[in-house]
From Swiss-Prot:
Keywords: Ribonucleoprotein, Ribosomal protein, RNA-binding, rRNA-binding. One of the primary rRNA binding proteins, it binds directly to 16S rRNA where it nucleates assembly of the body of the 30S subunit. Residues 94-157 form the S4 RNA-binding domain. GO terms for biological process: ribosomal small subunit biogenesis; translation. Residues 14-49 are annotated as: Disordered. Belongs to the universal ribosomal protein uS4 family. PROSITE patterns: RIBOSOMAL_S4, S4. Part of the 30S ribosomal subunit. Contacts protein S5. The interaction surface between S4 and S5 is involved in control of translational fidelity. It comes from Agrobacterium fabrum (strain C58 / ATCC 33970). This is Small ribosomal subunit protein uS4.
Amino acid sequence: MSKRESAKYKIDRRMGENIWGRPKSPVNRREYGPGQHGQRRKGKMSDFGTQLRAKQKLKGYYGELREKQFRATFDEANRRKGDTSENLISLLESRLDAIVYRAKFVPTVFASRQFINHGHVTVNGVRVNIGSYRCKAGDVIEVRQKSKQLVTVLEAVQLAERDVPDYIEVDHNKMVATYARVPSLSDVPYPVVMEPHLVVEFYSR
């Protein structure tokens, strides 16, 4: 198992949930966290603990984002008009690495970030190698010609465990996706319940 795979499953074990809906997730076989003390019975969680857990789960889902980066995203969501929790999800889903993952060009969000960093993706015809790059509605994301036959890409397209959401239009024959619209929380196909309102409460303490 690669370090990336190990880290990903460690997040699942820590959360006690299969947050990406992966068939090989260890929490499909056991219901306790990582480490020698993972089997201890958990008591009732405090409000702070519940809020912290919601933040960790959302950060983990998008590839274990660094706290500074996640907080900056929250701060921008908070500055925008409208519901902060909805704004937060919209900003996270507008990340290039999230869109490449949603389009099923890669098997995981971790692989998406690496794929982009290695220069395999263009946005509106221009190569972009920053996973956190923010896309706008109407942007066209394409796998570069020389990268379309990579085994990682070919296998990801065939994954039956997740579907492409309707806010992303994809042509897998051409390996092109259009970010059709910015989604709301109810549009996003999370395999587990995400609670961005608790993230808002956490940062509002």
